[in-house]
Amino acid sequence: MRREGTMRLHRTFLLRVYLKESAVITYPASKKIYCQGKIFPTIRVGMREIQLTNGDSLTLYDTSGPYSDPNISIKSPQGLPRLREPWIKVRPRKTQLAFAKEGVITPEMEYAAIRENQKRELKKNTDQERERRLQGNSLSARIPNPITPEFIRNEIACGRAILPANINHPESEPMIIGRHFLVKVNANIGNSSLTSSVEEEVEKLIWALRWGADTVMDLSTGKKIKEIRETILRHSPVPIGTVPLYEALEKVDGDVKALTWEIFRDTLISQAEQGVDYFTIHAGVLNRFIPLTQKRVTGIVSRGGSLMAKWCLLHREENFLYTHFTEICEIMRAYDVSFSLGDGLRPGSIADANDEAQFAELKIQGELNRIAWKYGVQVMNEGPGHIPLNLIEENMTKQLAYCREAPFYTLGPLTTDIAPGYDHIGSAIGAAFIAWQGCALLCYVTPKEHLGLPNKQDVKEGLIAYKIAAHAADLAKGHPAARQRDDLLSQARFEFRWHDQFNLALDAETARLFHDETLPKESAKHAHFCSLCGPKFCAYKTSHEVRDTLQKVT
């Protein structure tokens, strides 16, 4: 079967969604700047620049897209500017993987390389002893300085990285996912049969962008699934992923037995036409693996995995996502949609971690990777789940071996089961560890995990926890663009530049709020102490006095 995708670059309908004032994203002491491409001079890569009170500045990777540019007017029905449309129109219909294998650097590849470097080449470290001492341990990863478009091309060609960019999502700003790059974070949004509207989901999308979501998955399972997805795509500068099985099941009113390959196929094509950048496909849940879950404490906890297991048992047939995998590859190749091969048998409790069912599916994922690559389709692998700290390394080691170093995309993992309401913390611990080991994309967990549908505050708290985890891993790996923010914040802290401390923080508002709870006056922003130690016991203040004394003595 050969399928030609259709580019929907001129849409004939409008969306009845109107952006609120909250759609404008602002950051304190920051401005939007753009970096120009060299291979493709028309490329303008948006970044965030923080201005410090001592005249220094910091350039940051920015996921907010046009929402943080005051010079761009976003008209709600039409959505965002179609950044990639000119590039797509003038080139052959091929995937990023196909171009990469042919040795071709695309505009998307240069764009992603510029983002990764964050203008790092303009900042030189002069303390060589400190650089040697703090040099990261990237384990088996190779992180060049600077990251070049050619390096990105080669990583994609080898299957070690993906650049998710559907031809029908020209609004997206290219980004790269792989263990040799900055660790990325995914945020899940989407309605359920009980809550949420189109407007609320768009608001959640923009809110997730504000707090640093590198990708977003629309996991809607309620009403207006297609309308919500269309609206999100037209308003998203980051790649959007879905689980097509959810919409396919909605078409048969939730009757798993009534679900067919044909219904799923048509759903897949429809979503690819809309512009979805990556699909979670649970093709590794095979008939022979289902009995392996019988003795588990929590059975099959993946929604897609449990649905496909039920379908297999009802029909006494093999998983149609597996038997029709090559046809799925052909559809995805036509639109340059990336695979996110679902971990339908991931462990949902510490008791089930690293069991036979989990790793049996992972081996099948590796086999499916090779088929996808043969068809020129980019692929990453989804992983657990609930894993104690001592078993996390085994997950990463097996994934690299079975899946030939394809990007790993994990949900956490949660390192304990005792923290309902705080699972974002318990899972961020595991996320930081597995990201250091080589995981490329972390799916955030919110405080509402296992309890309910996340609201805006939950989205923020989940993202903050996971941006901390990702950054901690980048520091440990020695990513060349990682440590500068830490150093500048530490310098500001030692020099009592309170405003700079706040503005360099991941969450400036909360940092300022906590400080002002006890010392709200503006004069306190220039004081050489905070309310924790007071003026007499501040270690930094005393340290300055020690330095001054040493200078006089020497």
Swiss-Prot record:
Catalyzes the synthesis of the hydroxymethylpyrimidine phosphate (HMP-P) moiety of thiamine from aminoimidazole ribotide (AIR) in a radical S-adenosyl-L-methionine (SAM)-dependent reaction. It comes from the Bacteria. Substrate binds at residues 188, 217, 246, 282, 302-304, 343-346, 382, 409. Homodimer. Zn(2+) binds at residues 386, 450. Pfam families: ThiC-associated, ThiC_Rad_SAM. It catalyses: 5-amino-1-(5-phospho-beta-D-ribosyl)imidazole + S-adenosyl-L-methionine = 4-amino-2-methyl-5-(phosphooxymethyl)pyrimidine + CO + 5'-deoxyadenosine + formate + L-methionine + 3 H(+). The lineage of its organism: Bacteria, Pseudomonadati, Pseudomonadota, Gammaproteobacteria, Legionellales. Its cofactor is [4Fe-4S] cluster. The keyword Protein biosynthesis does not apply. The gene is thiC. It comes from Coxiella burnetii (strain Dugway 5J108-111). GO terms for biological process: thiamine biosynthetic process; thiamine diphosphate biosynthetic process. One of its GO terms (cellular component) is cytosol. This is Phosphomethylpyrimidine synthase.
